[in-house]
């Protein structure tokens, strides 16, 4: 049976099956780059198409339009909104205005671990490894290269790459050679 590598590259009407859990409709807004959202209903998670880099205004408008379409198509209105901890993300800024009674912040790399747990029906705990770029951490710094002991509702950071400056700011996320150079230079200055 083929396994989709990236379900959200196109319209995906078939839901990801979930273990029975909350009856609440949960809207997970995703991060800033490679934007997607997920709506849950009972034991099903409906993943949006890939909506682009949400730093771009057109992508933001498309994101809002797709979200409204999904809510109409599925007859869902979120009871809970889950957003990334990063305060400057588009998804973080719109979370409060989406009409849900409760907004929950989640650490970016913990969200990756939990999404894989949900997809495979694992309740945890697991060791989650995330090397996908930066994520706003609970200590107010940017995290990257995390090893987490993850459960569905919480996690403990077991290990991580050493903190080094981001050469070129957010460009370092899109141009990984910059971070490689910083780590090599940091070895010289031990």
Specify the residue positions occupied by each region the protein language model found.
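Conserved small/polar residues in nucleotide/adenosyl-binding loops
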Residues: 188-190
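Short glycine-aspartate micro-motif
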Residues: 26-28, 82, 126-130
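Internal gly/pro-rich beta-alpha loop/helix module
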Residues: 1-20
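Gly-rich Lys/Arg/Thr-decorated short loops/hinges at beta-loop-alpha junctions or inter-strand turns
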Residues: 39-55, 74, 160
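Active-site histidine-anchored catalytic micro-motif
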Residues: 117-183
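Short glycine-rich phosphate-binding loop at a beta-alpha junction
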Residues: 76-87
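Phosphate/pyrophosphate-binding loops at sites that engage ATP/ADP/AMP, CoA/4′-phosphopantetheine
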Residues: 67-78
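Short Gly/Thr/Asp-enriched flexible loops that form oxyanion-binding sites at enzyme active sites
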Residues: 86-100, 138-149
């Amino acid at each position: 049976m083929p396994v989709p590598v990236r379900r959200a590259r196109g319209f995906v009407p078939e839901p990801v099956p979930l273990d029975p859990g909350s009856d609440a409709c949960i809207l997970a807004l995703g991060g800033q780059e490679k934007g997607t959202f997920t709506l849950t209903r009972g034991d099903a998670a409906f993943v949006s198409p890939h909506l682009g880099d949400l730093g771009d205004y057109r992508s933001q408008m498309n994101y809002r339009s797709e979200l409204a379409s999904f809510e109409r198509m599925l007859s869902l209105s979120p009871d809970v909104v889950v957003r990334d901890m990063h305060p400057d993300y588009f998804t973080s800024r719109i979370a409060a205005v989406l009409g849900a009674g409760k907004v929950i912040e989640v650490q970016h790399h913990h969200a990756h671990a939990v999404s894989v747990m949900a997809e495979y029906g694992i309740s945890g705990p697991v060791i989650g490894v995330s090397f996908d770029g930066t994520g706003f951490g609970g200590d107010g710094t940017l995290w990257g290269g995390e090893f987490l002991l993850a459960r569905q509702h919480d996690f403990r950071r077991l290990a991580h790459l050493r903190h080094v400056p981001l050469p070129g700011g957010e460009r370092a996320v899109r141009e990984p050679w910059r971070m490689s150079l910083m780590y090599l230079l940091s070895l010289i200055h031990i």
